[in-house]
């Protein structure tokens, strides 16, 4: 296919990219609400394709410690995807899922095994919801791996696909996600397809 610039691609596919974000967030909100037993609203203020090298500046300070839930994707497309969440939001969601009340977290970077497991499940639901929406829009079969979770600097987490798995691409789909419950939570879904898969996605949209 013709290799358009990112600005041209975002202009051409703005509606379908937003639809992927809206459908995915709606499915994720329903699933998470059922888990925590309270109403959850999710909004997608921003969806765009961008250079992988600019992801760090798009999501905030690269030296900031965040929670990252990471999965590989395969079959019709190859690449990786992740969901990033700030520490305060992570503790809030973990407390909700584990039914903890009035907990004071003195060490924000510390999560126990149960908390990490709960957050991994949240990340799995959100990434699976967006992935399902993308698969429906493109008629591509996209299979996720088992997720894993880590707490580290944003720059370190964003480098995982290339360092750990040799997955290399220069484009990413970034979906900014706002989760509205008792407090507002902002997270980022990122799909980083390999170069051939990137063009396959665009051809299928």
Write out the residue ranges for each language-model feature.
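Composition-driven recognition of glycine/serine/threonine/acidic- and proline-rich low-complexity segments
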Residues: 2-27, 31-205
């Amino acid at each position: 296919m013709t290799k358009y610039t990112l600005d041209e691609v975002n202009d051409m596919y703005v509606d379908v990219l937003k639809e992927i974000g809206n459908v995915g967030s709606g499915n994720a909100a329903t699933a998470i609400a059922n888990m925590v037993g309270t109403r959850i609203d999710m909004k997608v203020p921003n969806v765009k394709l961008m250079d992988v090298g600019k992801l760090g500046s798009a999501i905030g300070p690269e030296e900031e410690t965040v929670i990252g839930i990471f999965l590989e994707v395969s079959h019709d497309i190859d690449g990786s995807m992740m969901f990033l969440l700030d520490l305060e939001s992570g503790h809030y969601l973990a407390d909700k899922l584990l039914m903890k009340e009035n907990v004071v977290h003195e060490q924000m970077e510390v999560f126990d095994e149960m908390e990490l497991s709960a957050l991994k499940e949240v990340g799995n639901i959100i990434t699976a919801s967006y992935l399902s929406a993308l698969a429906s829009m493109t008629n591509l079969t996209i299979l996720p791996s088992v997720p894993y979770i880590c707490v580290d600097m944003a720059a370190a987490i964003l480098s995982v696909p290339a360092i750990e798995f040799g997955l290399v691409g220069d484009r990413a789909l970034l979906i900014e996600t706002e989760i509205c419950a008792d407090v507002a939570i902002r997270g980022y879904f990122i799909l980083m397809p390999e170069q051939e898969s990137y063009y396959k996605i665009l051809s299928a949209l």
